Amino acid sequence: MKISEVIEFVDIGAGDGFNMSIAFPLSKSFATRGLLIEPNVKQLEFARRIYKNYDFSFCSEFLDPVNISDILKKFGFLNPTYIKIDIDSFDLDLLRGILHSHILPKIFSIEINELFPPPFKFEVKYKGEIVPCTSPLFGCSLQSVVDLATEMNYSLVSLAFNNAFFVYNDSMRGDLKSYNSKSRLLYEIGFLNRNWRELFPWDIKYEHWLKASATQLDRLVKKHEGFDEARMIIY
């Protein structure tokens, strides 16, 4: 990707467009065209105000794996440079809906559930309705994303605490390294061996999950009060 080209990005779970959003850093560093998707209308209106002079579109529709491709098509983002997903729910199913619709960004990032280290797999599934999820049972594990990424020709290149970054293999530069087969190593580098207790203090009471065996973790998850057998799978 040439730095001089316009970066087209889609921020799914954009919030107010500033805090935890990719819109601000990208717009300050590159020529951008963006789509900010956020169902919280008040937050989206704040984003609309601060980016009124930018080539940004705004969407407050609730997304699901079925309608996501139509929404991206409606706003003209069928070939985006970068897609970010952070909805704290069926994030992986939403990503599947995008990639299986042949919308293949050069880069995507997704928030992972940091309490499930590779090789353990966990995900919240979409079952036809929007149901909020809460810590510690939300989103998906890093390994679950890596499996989908490998299938769709993407490489895991970085993990910044609970945000994983993937690059389409045809866009990989020579200085980038794929961690698809070494996801546990990257998890240790990007999360486990860093100051996560300071940044994620609410995770400390689940620290024993990080050291559990497969059998132990399966039991811990399924007996947790937030576990929903109809929507959550650990495998």
Residue ranges and their predicted role:
Residues 1-7, 164-181:
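Accessory recognition modules or surfaces
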Residues 1-74, 78-85, 114-117, 192-213, ...:
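SAM cofactor-binding core of SAM-dependent methyltransferases
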Residues 26-30, 98-105:
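Short, conserved loop/helix-junction motifs that constitute active-site signature segments
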Residues 84-97:
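Active-site glycine- and acidic-residue-rich loops that bind
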Residues 104-114:
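Conserved beta-strand signature within the Rossmann-like core of class I S-adenosyl-L-methionine
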Residues 117-167:
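A conserved mid-domain beta-alpha-beta active-site/ligand-binding segment of alpha/beta enzyme cores
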Residues 171-200:
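Flexible, glycine-/basic-rich loop-and-beta segments that form/coincide
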Residues 216-233:
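Anion-recognition interface
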